[in-house]
C-alpha cells in the first residue's frame, strides 16, 4: 500500500473562455471542479496503474467534504484529518491559449491540529510500504513539518518520495532524516544551491553531488522536453525522451512521481524506474485532464525512452 500526502489540497475549478474580458462580465458554458493538489494527482495516477493507494492530508468544511466525495466516486481510499478551517479553492481561467490562475492560500493549521495529524499519520504508517509527499505546506505549520514526517518513516523503514521546493525542501535536506527520492526540476535544483542555471552534464553531476544532498538515495532532475538527469547513490543517468504532442503539461510532474513511487514499491531496477516515471509523465501531458494517463499508449512510449549511464 502506498500512502500519499497532500497537506494543502484544493477544489480546482476550471473556467474555459473564448476570451477573458477584464472589468466586465464573463459567462462560462462549462465548469470543471475536481479534487486538486499535487498529491491527489499522484494518487489518481497510482490508482490508474493499479497500485493500492491511500490518500491523506488536511481537509475542512464543505470543500473538504467535496474532495472526499470526489475520491469516493473514483473508488480511491482516503483517510484525511479534519480541521476547523475551510479547504481552499484554486481557479484556472483558460483563455486564448493561456491560463490565468487565482490560488487561495488555504486554511491555517493550529498547533493542536498539527500534532493531531502526526499521531494520525503514525497510525497510517503501520500499514503502508511507501509514502509520497507532494506540494506546499499550509499556513501555520513549522517549516520542518515534512522533516518530522520523514523521521517517522525512516524509523519504520518506509521509503519517502518527496516533491516540494524552495525553503521547505531546503529544510528537509538540512535535516538528518532524508527522503529516499527528491524530484526537483533544473531551476529548483540550482536555486537550492544558489548557483546560476547550467544544463551541461558536468555541471549537473557536480550539482547533485553537493553535500546538501548527502544521504538522499535518488535525485531525479526534470529537464522538461529534454528528459531527465538522475543520480542513484553513486551512479548518474541521462534520460532521453521522444518528442510528443503536448496537450496539457499540468500534472506531468505528479504523474512522474507516481511512476517513481510505483517502481520503488515494486523494487524495480534503475532502468525501469526511470522509464516508468518518464512514460507516465509524458502520458499525462498528452491528455487534457490533469492527473490522467491513457495506458493504451504506455508500451509505445516506454520503449522509445533511452536511459544512459553517464
Swiss-Prot record:
Q: Which GO terms describe its biological process?
A: D-tagatose 6-phosphate catabolic process; lactose catabolic process via tagatose-6-phosphate
Tell me which EC number(s) this protein carries: 2.7.1.144
Q: Which GO terms describe its cellular component?
A: cytosol
Enzyme class per UniProt: transferase
Show the Gene3D superfamilies listed in the entry: 3.40.1190.20
What one GO molecular function would you report for this record? tagatose-6-phosphate kinase activity
Q: What parts of the sequence cross the membrane?
A: none
Q: Which UniProt keywords apply?
A: ATP-binding, Kinase, Lactose metabolism, Nucleotide-binding, Transferase
Specify the pathway: Carbohydrate metabolism; D-tagatose 6-phosphate degradation; D-glyceraldehyde 3-phosphate and glycerone phosphate from D-tagatose 6-phosphate: step 1/2
Give the signal peptide, or none. none
Chemical reaction(s) catalysed: D-tagatofuranose 6-phosphate + ATP = D-tagatofuranose 1,6-bisphosphate + ADP + H(+)
Alphabetized NCBIfam families for the sequence: 1-PFK (TIGR03168), lacC (TIGR01231), PRK13508.1 (NF010033)
Q: Can you tell me which family this protein belongs to?
A: Belongs to the carbohydrate kinase PfkB family. LacC subfamily.
Q: What is this protein called?
A: Tagatose-6-phosphate kinase
- What is the source species? Staphylococcus aureus (strain bovine RF122 / ET3-1)
Amino acid at each position: 500500500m502506498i500512502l500519499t500526502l497532500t497537506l494543502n489540497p484544493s477544489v480546482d475549478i476550471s473556467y474555459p473562455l473564448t476570451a477573458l474580458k477584464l472589468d466586465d462580465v464573463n459567462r462560462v458554458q462549462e465548469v470543471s471542479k475536481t479534487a486538486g493538489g499535487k498529491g491527489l494527482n499522484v494518487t489518481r495516477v497510482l490508482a490508474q496503474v493499479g497500485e493500492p493507494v491511500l490518500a491523506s492530508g488536511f481537509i475542512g468544511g464543505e470543500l473538504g467534504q467535496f474532495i472526499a466525495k470526489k475520491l469516493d466516486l473514483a473508488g480511491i481510499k482516503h483517510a484525511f484529518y479534519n480541521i476547523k478551517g475551510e479547504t481552499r479553492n484554486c481557479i484556472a481561467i483558460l483563455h486564448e491559449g493561456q491560463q490565468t490562475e487565482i490560488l487561495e492560500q488555504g486554511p491555517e493549521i493550529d498547533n493542536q491540529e498539527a500534532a493531531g495529524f502526526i499521531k494520525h499519520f503514525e497510525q497510517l504508517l503501520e500499514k503502508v510500504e511507501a509514502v509520497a509527499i507532494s506540494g506546499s505546506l499550509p499556513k501555520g505549520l513549522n517549516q520542518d513539518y515534512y522533516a518530522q514526517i520523514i523521521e517517522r518513516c525512516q524509523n519504520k523503514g518506509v521509503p519517502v518520495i518527496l516533491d516540494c521546493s524552495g525553503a521547505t525542501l531546503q529544510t528537509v535536506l538540512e535535516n538528518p532524516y532524508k527522503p529516499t527520492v527528491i524530484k526537483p526540476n533544473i531551476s529548483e535544483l540550482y536555486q537550492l544551491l544558489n548557483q546560476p542555471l547550467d544544463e551541461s552534464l558536468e555541471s549537473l553531476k557536480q550539482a547533485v553531488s553537493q553535500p546538501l544532498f548527502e544521504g538522499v538515495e535518488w535525485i531525479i532532475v526534470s529537464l522538461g522536453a529534454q528528459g531527465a538527469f538522475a543520480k542513484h547513490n553513486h551512479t548518474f543517468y541521462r534520460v532521453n525522451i521522444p518528442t510528443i504532442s503536448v496537450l496539457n503539461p499540468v500534472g506531468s510532474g505528479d504523474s512522474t512521481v507516481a511512476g517513481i513511487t510505483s517502481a520503488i514499491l515494486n523494487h524495480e531496477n534503475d532502468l525501469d524506474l526511470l522509464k516508468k516515471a518518464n512514460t507516465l509523465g509524458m502520458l499525462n501531458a498528452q491528455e487534457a485532464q490533469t492527473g490522467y494517463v491513457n495506458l493504451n499508449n504506455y508500451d509505445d512510449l516506454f520503449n522509445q525512452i533511452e536511459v544512459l549511464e553517464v
